[in-house]
Structure formats: structure tokens, C-alpha cells
Amino acid sequence: MMSLLTPAVLLTQRSHTLTLSVSTPLGLVMTTYESSTLKDARLKLVSQKEVNGKLHLTLGAGRLLYIIRIFLATGTTQFLTMVLPSTASVDSLPGTYLRRC
């Protein structure tokens, strides 16, 4: 169940692109991320939380974590990629896999 306090989020993955749409107080914010590491990746939404006016999304595939921060007051986004240690994998974390379009 999603909290009514959390902004609505739509993630769409196609090949090596990820499209993010977020409903904020300023309106709809849409951003597209392209990365060769997203190609053929089976993305999993690991966490989604809102903290101090920022929406934090954590996605993962294999040993890669993709962290997306959306500043709700301005609509600005940040996209970070992290590599997990060789003994760790996103597959062992709880979460929901995204369906491909």
C-alpha cells in the first residue's frame, strides 16, 4: 500500500533508458536517464521514501544500485550509480521488479 503523502511515481524502462515521471506540488516532473548499464538490466525497486522534501528512489540490478533523488520544491533530480561489493547482489534485497515495456 502506498502512503497518500508520497508523491505518485511512474518508472518506465526501455532498453538502456529509464523514464521517470513524478507528480510534485509544482506539477509533473519527467526525466529520462540513459546508461549502457541499464541495457538488458532487470531493475528492482528496492526502496521509495520521502525525507525533508526529497523523494529518494533506490533501484537495483545485479551488483549495481541506481539512486534517484527528486527535490520536490524545485523539481530537480539527481541520478547516482553505485557498485556493490563483489559478495553482494540486489537480487537478495526485498523489492519489486519493474516490468519491461
UniProtKB/Swiss-Prot annotation:
Coiled coil: none annotated. The keyword Transport does not apply. The keyword Phosphoprotein does not apply. Keywords: Eukaryotic host gene expression shutoff by virus, Eukaryotic host transcription shutoff by virus, Host gene expression shutoff by virus, Host-virus interaction, Inhibition of host RNA polymerase II by virus. GO terms for biological process: negative regulation by virus of viral protein levels in host cell; symbiont-mediated suppression of host gene expression; symbiont-mediated suppression of host mRNA transcription via inhibition of RNA polymerase II activity; symbiont-mediated suppression of host type I interferon-mediated signaling pathway; viral gene expression. Belongs to the orthobunyavirus NS-S protein family. Inhibits host transcriptional machinery, by producing modifications to the phosphorylation state of the C-terminal domain (CTD) of RNA polymerase II. Inhibits phosphorylation at serine 2 in the heptapeptide repeat (YSPTSPS) of the CTD of RNA polymerase II, suggesting that the elongation step of transcription and/or 3'-end processing is prevented. Inhibition of host transcription machinery leads to shut off of host cell protein synthesis and inhibition of the host innate immune response. NSs also seems to be involved in the nuclear relocalization of host PABP1. This is Non-structural protein NS-S. It comes from Bunyamwera virus. The lineage of its organism: Viruses, Riboviria, Orthornavirae, Negarnaviricota, Polyploviricotina. The gene is N.
